[in-house]
Amino acid sequence: MKEIPVESLEPGMKFTAPLYMDEENIIVPEQAPVKAKDIERLKKWKLVVVHTEGEMINPESEEAEPGGLQGLIKKAFSSPAQKEVTKLYIRYSQKIRDFFRDIDQRNAPDSLEIKDFIDKVLELIARHKDDVIQYILYGKHGESDEAENALNATILSILIGQECNLLSHKIHQLAASALLRDSGMLRIPAKIRDKKGELTPDELREIKTHPVHSYRIITKEIGFSEDVGIPAMQHQERWDGKGYPKNIRGSDISLHARIISIADAFEAMVSERPHRSAMTGNKAMRTMLGDNG
């Protein structure tokens, strides 16, 4: 890949291929403009060069192209692979909404239906891993709903599990736990879970019971084993013992729960929420690495 001196970067520059900080981490997607804050980050992190396999796009060649930011986004995600990822992401998000609707109506799907869905997500990752990651980091704009959050957390948990060299059946269990980790929120009264203002102490205690409800949904209603239920129940526990619902700590927290916790935290940072904008993937990772909790 070519080396581009950081000092030569200017806001608004665009390239025909992504700009990389190193061999794996993208700082700017292909055909997206370099932002002043991107340059500031690179300098703050004391990076001297970035890398790309592409060429700088001549601004004059784009003068006649309308579309603004949305046009740039559309162009950046217009490859055949990204179009397929976008189509399947939308389809799978809707399937999760259907799962959650059925759970809410006390008509939970069975474990075989969930397993079949996870197989489809695993196939998507196997075929388009890099494009899926790009979509989670850059392709979704606007607030994410519970289904999209669940899909993102499931994909990220699978990717972490694969990097940990988990066996195939363990990856399936991990994915099911991640997918259903917050299903227990559907057992919390809507007036509490949808409340916009600050929660009262009693309401907060109610919210903190949702992992237990998730465990019961997973094991009693859907029919998964404890290997799927326990990580979902433990995903809000923390290494220092300050999590919930049982305040367990350290290695007493299952590995799968720890993986889901990391994926969940990262997903929350890169997804837009009503009270804040999404972070970039790099900022989210650096925030997590700097969080001692």
What do these predicted ranges mean?
Residues 1-113:
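Membrane-cytosol interface segments
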Residues 66-208, 215-227:
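Acidic/His-rich, divalent-metal-binding segments that scaffold phosphate/diphosphate chemistry
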Residues 178, 218-221, 225-257, 275-276, ...:
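Histidine/acidic-rich helix-loop-helix segments that form or flank divalent-metal centers
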Residues 188-189, 241, 271:
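Active-site-flanking alpha-helical
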Residues 210, 270, 274, 293:
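Active-site neighborhoods and metal-handling regions in enzymes and metal-associated proteins
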Residues 258-271:
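Conserved beta-strand-loop-short alpha-helix elements that form
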